Amino acid sequence: MTPAVTQTILTVRIARPHGYGYVLLSRGFSALNRPPPNYPGHIPLTTFERGALAVGSAIGSLLNPRRGDLIAALGEATATPYFIYRLRDAMLSDPTGRRILRDRPRISSKTLSIEYLRSLPPNTVGRTYVGWLDREGVGPDTRAPVQYIDDEECAYVMQRYRECHDFYHAITGLPVVVEGEVALKTFEFANTLLPMTGLSMFAVMRLKPAERERFWKLHLPWAIRSGLASKEVINVYWEEQLERDANELREELGIEKPADLREIRKMMRRQKAAEEAAKAKDGQ
């Protein structure tokens, strides 16, 4: 092989029990067999690679639901060939969705003034959003760029969904704990039909018994009911809604606000502490 022929390596992360980490498996593919990228950062995949990426990232994200990179890879590997196109078509069929596709806005600390959002009146969408970011200790710059979706426009749709995820958190009030993430992902599945959001429900098995019971009885019915009843959230131009009343926007979208999960968890912890204190007192 001449020096002009380069070798491209795709690393497929397949999680296997190995302490607290996972084993990385690599397979090399000749650049001659790989089509050129369709946009900056694009990594074209063969059918085998896409399947391996889906399986590996699914296992890895199940073992560690906090691995955002694996969840992102799973989302991209399972979104094609149908689901991301359905979401793109939903945007094309909506006037606001078409504007979003034309304008290609991005959500980051460079495009949103966090200090301005903090100055907005209470209960506005912007103040609710930044309040949620502050409370959860996260920021708008944590979303990885899309790499594995071939169609450039569909890649933007996935990027837009990914960057709007925290707005979904803020408008529903769900925290970033695993219980809150699973509830929100279930809502997103009912609303967007992206397979990754549905597969995230398997993380329920990692919840504590009380949390699982709460999910089945409280969060799952809410997520299905609200996700199916609400408008397509991908078509919300969040940048234009920042000064609106959050309750008004929820009503317009048809999103029912779930029970305050943080307050529920606090109440359960207080109740457990009181029960343990009572047992300790009885044992004296």
From Swiss-Prot:
Its main location: mitochondrion. It catalyses: a 4-hydroxy-3-methoxy-5-(all-trans-polyprenyl)benzoate + H(+) = a 2-methoxy-6-(all-trans-polyprenyl)phenol + CO2. Pfam families: Coq4 (PF05019). Its EC number is 4.1.1.130. GO terms for biological process: ubiquinone biosynthetic process. Pathway: Cofactor biosynthesis; ubiquinone biosynthesis. It is a peripheral membrane protein. It comes from the Eukaryota. It is found in: Mitochondrion inner membrane. Zn(2+) binds at H165, D166, H169, E181. Its cofactor is Zn(2+). One of its GO terms (cellular component) is extrinsic component of mitochondrial inner membrane. InterPro entries: Coq4, Coq4_euk. Keywords: Lyase, Membrane, Metal-binding, Mitochondrion, Mitochondrion inner membrane, Ubiquinone biosynthesis, Zinc. Belongs to the COQ4 family. Lyase that catalyzes the C1-decarboxylation of 4-hydroxy-3-methoxy-5-(all-trans-polyprenyl)benzoic acid into 2-methoxy-6-(all-trans-polyprenyl)phenol during ubiquinone biosynthesis. HAMAP family: Coq4 (MF_03111). Component of a multi-subunit COQ enzyme complex, composed of at least COQ3, COQ4, COQ5, COQ6, COQ7 and COQ9. This protein may be expected to contain an N-terminal transit peptide but none has been predicted. This is Ubiquinone biosynthesis protein COQ4, mitochondrial.
